[in-house]
Curated annotation (Swiss-Prot):
Pathways involved: Metabolic intermediate biosynthesis; 1-deoxy-D-xylulose 5-phosphate biosynthesis; 1-deoxy-D-xylulose 5-phosphate from D-glyceraldehyde 3-phosphate and pyruvate: step 1/1
Molecular function GO labels: 1-deoxy-D-xylulose-5-phosphate synthase activity; magnesium ion binding; thiamine pyrophosphate binding
Domain of life: Bacteria
Keyword Metal-binding: yes
GO biological process, one term: terpenoid biosynthetic process
Function per UniProt: Catalyzes the acyloin condensation reaction between C atoms 2 and 3 of pyruvate and glyceraldehyde 3-phosphate to yield 1-deoxy-D-xylulose-5-phosphate (DXP).
PANTHER family: 1-D-DEOXYXYLULOSE 5-PHOSPHATE SYNTHASE-RELATED, 1-DEOXY-D-XYLULOSE-5-PHOSPHATE SYNTHASE, CHLOROPLASTIC
A GO term from the CC aspect: cytosol
Protein name as it appears in the record: 1-deoxy-D-xylulose-5-phosphate synthase
Cofactor info, note text: Binds 1 Mg(2+) ion per subunit.
Amino acid sequence: MPKTLHEIPRERPATPLLDRASSPAELRRLGEADLETLADELRQYLLYTVGQTGGHFGAGLGVVELTIALHYVFDTPDDRLVWDVGHQAYPHKILTERRELMGTLRQKNGLAAFPRRAESEYDTFGVGHSSTSISAALGMAIAARLQGKERKSVAVIGDGALTAGMAFEALNHASEVDADMLVILNDNDMSISHNVGGLSNYLAKILSSRTYSSMREGSKKVLSRLPGAWEIARRTEEYAKGMLVPGTLFEELGWNYIGPIDGHDLPTLVATLRNMRDMKGPQFLHVVTKKGKGFAPAELDPIGYHAITKLEAPGSAPKKTGGPKYSSVFGQWLCDMAAQDARLLGITPAMKEGSDLVAFSERYPERYFDVAIAEQHAVTLAAGMACEGMKPVVAIYSTFLQRAYDQLIHDVAVQHLDVLFAIDRAGLVGEDGPTHAGSFDISYLRCIPGMLVMTPSDEDELRKLLTTGYLFDGPAAVRYPRGSGPNHPIDPDLQPVEIGKGVVRRRGGRVALLVFGVQLAEAMKVAESLDATVVDMRFVKPLDEALVRELAGSHELLVTIEENAVMGGAGSAVGEFLASEGLEVPLLQLGLPDYYVEHAKPSEMLAECGLDAAGIEKAVRQRLDRQ
């Protein structure tokens, strides 16, 4: 059994076996008797490195044994191993020639937080969003068949990610094409079955054995010649297995289901994977693990230890600065508005903690809906609720709303339904990198007819604009970033603002800075040195055209500032209006560049994009010098 630790090591632990397994090839030279000791060392090293850098935590601890077994049995990187989401991939990185680089994890120019093709040949598919692994591994399996290659394709997916429709679409397609691939369900929530133990492990070994597989294939060849006989035999086998193991659903989808087995029992994992490696057709292995395994605090609080920040030296922990988190402001607003309006319903696609819906879910459980990882369903669910006079609020990360774009247009906007989208994590998100950045929501929202799109500049503005969007008759979106605000006083009243009207925060001379969002604070820092007018635009759509027209007539340069892609963003909206009016004032658009900004600290990313105070001032002065 894995050893259980109670503290994160502050000193690098001794790992003599792990030092001999820097690559899967070296790992495969170890004896099976060494693997359990290797697992203990890998878990200690993982605790140490994540303690130094911060990062996703519990999921990786839970798949230490599974990761070792996969690389021990399969010929990676020639065999294709695809991790879903990637939260659990740190042990994989350690075993695939990146152990000594783990100290750079999630840092600028360091290792990415998720598997990434450009980083290693062992990262066969770049991930970050959930439920993509089975589709990707199926594509690889089909390619191998067409290329005449014998390589294996393996997808590892969690029980949460398996709830998404895309995963079931891939399962269905794989059975249709009879793909030679293996899907491993990493069930770390016990949401599918508690049926784990000696009997399940024994059955898994039997059902995955060469003898059983040969008998099954031989019987299939004989019985397939007899009309109806093979179908009767198949159903009999399925019924017998279904009485003992909970795989009927997957068997119905055309998969050979094995499990559930203990995902921390290395001998069973290795034996079962060896048996399944050479089995033909779609194979499904159900493995039960414990999130946070081997670290007592994480086992007791798997949600709280999903990710951690880096350890600070004793007595040196930084004091909290700034205001409340934007997500907390949203969570409080949701509860306050719900107290006033019984029609309000809260919807989240598996982001209760991240979007700060915990208090709402506890106060109004009958009005709270966590639809799991099902963004498309979340949006159309809200549309159906709105059809019946309810007031749904969809709390969703910007990067995940992309997954429901058709539903946003077809099911909500075309019907002009009254749905409010509270779009969290808008803009750059720091160490999680480009897969989690909300770089495009202004661009993909402002082109939708009838959509109200708002960009608050601080905590108080967020509360006001949420109220404005909630009271608006039609689809509305409020985008706000990860992290804390500037500690602006918050008006407790639920008061809306006038739609389509910006606010001039400072009057200046030659330059007008038109700010869409939280960069207002950075713009104010340089306003005096630039003698600039500073405007909190508030609304991307409808744009405050009267204000833009007035600013164009009284300034030599207009500068738009947004934490969104420049292409198609708020600056583009201003440029389109100026062109339509024949206003020839120069326009400088500052925002995210036309490339994916790699993971780093948020301050480093903003500096790279020229969206901090220094970058804004530099860009404006360079433009003025050319005029």
